[in-house]
């Protein structure tokens, strides 16, 4: 299992961005990571898995979050189609993301790859599974006031890999298990 970079040259990997340069740079690093992962897999048994964060974050809070999320979802589809890979040689696993991630020394607002509807639709469109981060799911469910058990039941058929840690509130990420609220 390989985890793709989230930050390159102090710029967030974000294929959902409206900034063409950022999307191009993000697609470039993801393509290089895909190619390198496939090359590394020649030394191991089985198809490699690549955990990917697609982005969809902003420093500012949006006025119309549903519209922002819908636009980022559309942009992620458009961008993902540009990646060149053979699903027989690598399993790409987008990871569900938290609502208030910390990047580059500050708290951001996440608008992509959190809601179960968009994750499921994306997975169906590209025949993908996901990396299910329990901490991220808990943070999102706390933020969106959703039941984590119901949320997880909907996502479960698409899970291929799991990240486990505890959490607190809507931005307390990566807490030691049994020291948080999950």
Where are the model-predicted features located?
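Gly/Pro-rich active-site loop or hairpin
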Residues: 14-23, 107-113, 136-182
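Hydrophobic faces of well-ordered beta-strands that scaffold small-molecule active sites
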Residues: 1-5, 48-52, 92-95, 130-133, ...
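Active-site beta-loop-alpha junctions enriched in small/polar residues
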Residues: 5-7, 55-57, 95-99, 134-139, ...
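Short, functional N-terminal and low-complexity linear motifs
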Residues: 1-3, 118-119, 152-159
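Active-site acidic/histidine proton-transfer and metal-coordination neighborhood
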Residues: 13-129, 139
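A short glycine/small-residue-enriched secondary-structure motif
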Residues: 3-14
């Amino acid at each position: 299992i390989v985890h793709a970079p989230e930050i390159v040259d102090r710029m967030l990997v974000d294929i959902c961005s409206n900034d063409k340069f950022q999307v191009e740079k993000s697609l470039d690093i993801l393509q290089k990571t895909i190619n390198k992962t496939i090359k590394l897999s020649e030394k191991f048994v089985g198809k490699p898995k690549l955990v990917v964060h697609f982005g969809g974050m902003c420093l500012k809070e949006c006025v119309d979050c549903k519209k922002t999320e819908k636009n980022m979802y559309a942009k992620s589809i458009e961008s993902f189609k540009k990646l060149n890979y053979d699903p027989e040689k690598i399993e790409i696993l987008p990871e569900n993301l938290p609502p208030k991630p910390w990047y580059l020394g500050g708290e951001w607002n996440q608008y992509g790859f959190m809601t179960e509807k968009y994750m499921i639709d994306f997975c169906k469109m590209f025949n993908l599974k996901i990396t299910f981060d329990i901490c991220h799911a808990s943070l999102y469910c706390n933020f969106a006031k959703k039941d984590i058990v119901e949320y997880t039941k909907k996502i479960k058929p698409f899970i291929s890999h799991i990240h486990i840690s505890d959490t607190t509130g809507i931005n307390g990420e990566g807490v030691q298990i049994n020291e948080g609220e999950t």
